[in-house]
Amino acid sequence: MKSISKMLCLVDGEHYLPVTQESIDVLNNLEHIDIVAAVFIGGTEKLRDDSEESYSKVLGVPVQFAKNEDIPYDIIVEMINRYDVDTVMDLSDEPILDYPKRFKIACKTLAQGVSYQGPDFKFDPVTQYEIMEKPSIKIIGTGKRIGKTAVSGFVSRLIDKNGYEPCVIAMGRGGPQEPEIVHGEQLEITPEFLLEQSEKGVHAASDHWEDALMSRILTIGCRRCGGGMAGEVFLTNMKKGAKLANQVDSKFAIFEGSGAAIPPIKTNKNIVLIGANQPLNNIIDYFGPYRIGLGDLIILTMCEEPMCNEEKREYIEKFIKEINPKAKIISTVFRPKPLADISGKKVLFATTAPKSIEHELVDYLETNYNCEIVGTTPHLSNRPLLKKDIEKYMDEADIMLTELKAAAVDVATKDSIKAGLDVVYCDNIPVPINYKYPDLSKSVLEIVDEAIEDFNKD
């Protein structure tokens, strides 16, 4: 038997009141629905009486009117909380609501843990299991290839170095069928070891292997398939992974999202990553504002030309402040950090970074690590092109320096070892673009302390 769903209806003055009344009655006659209130969101064409009292009397439920001509987003949120609403039903239409306005309503309602639906659509809040028995944070993003795993590695190392004893639970599209523990603090994770794992059928460039290699801490690998508009996944074993995280010898848990998908585990605090390289409408429209609203700390990545100019970065920062004024914002770039000495070596560098910033990365490596970059490839996620680039440069290089992404193991590592090259893996470090931003390490540790405080309150 279905439980009763408390419903808030959005109505307008573009419909005759008797038509709206009939729709309310149809919904109220459904056994599992209880219409608790309505919000009048605008329109005057067919409105004969703008009295809340008379309108409420006809509809048979309390009706709250907008105080001006704008869509009353704040009133919708207020009514959701006042009446403990489960679902917002949209009985409006063009011209009162267009697509952007409806997405904005969806972001507002989902942020309250409430569904938003209309005649042919429905958006539900993302699943959040309340199962953690230790303090935890989520690291989520607004898309793929924005540096989530790199930031997760940075955060994990920082937390571990400061004595918080963390573990990482990561979900990926190539993750294991059953949650897999990798003891990064115990294993010697060499290129040969990862290649051996890959040949056994393990996705050895999966995020939890990268986390284990880069951070040298315990990681738990999970899988996921599909990603909804608001971040829900179709399939994942991360709930099992979270239960495993409760049992392992760690005191703090870091849940790492995948692409724009959100881990289905309720955590104490959230770090949200936004790729400044993304199309602007992916950030400010659709469900971008919803994800931004989840952040306690927001890290804007890839803030350099040609991916993002100063004008775009400042616009994004301003938008974030409007959506989530309480969150701290830090704009960053990524810079490579080899995990072994490459001084004096001739290096072939494989990365997922776009070719447009190749010069900056090459200059950084040669200046800071005393090496000579003899070739680069931005094709770690394109196996055929990656193979061609390796063949092109392998006779000039001593070392393959590669991020642990995509085809880094089954192509870059395998082909390089076969050609007699040493393989060194490379981390990416987030660096604030200037001194005006808060200290990144300090800001992360503040979020960790707040998460611990929040956990201890419960």
UniProtKB/Swiss-Prot annotation:
Gene Ontology biological process terms, A to Z: gluconeogenesis
Does the UniProt entry include the keyword ATP-binding? yes
Q: What is this protein called?
A: Cyclic 2,3-diphosphoglycerate synthetase
Please state which protein family the record places this protein in.
Belongs to the cyclic 2,3-diphosphoglycerate synthetase family.
Q: What class of enzyme is it?
A: ligase
Q: Known catalysed reaction(s)?
A: (2R)-2,3-bisphosphoglycerate + ATP + H(+) = cyclic (2R)-2,3-bisphosphoglycerate + ADP + phosphate
Q: What is its EC number?
A: 6.5.1.9
Write out the annotated subcellular location: Cytoplasm
Any idea what job this protein has? Catalyzes the formation of cyclic 2,3-diphosphoglycerate (cDPG) by formation of an intramolecular phosphoanhydride bond at the expense of ATP.
A GO molecular function assigned to this protein is:
ligase activity
Q: What is its main location?
A: cytoplasm
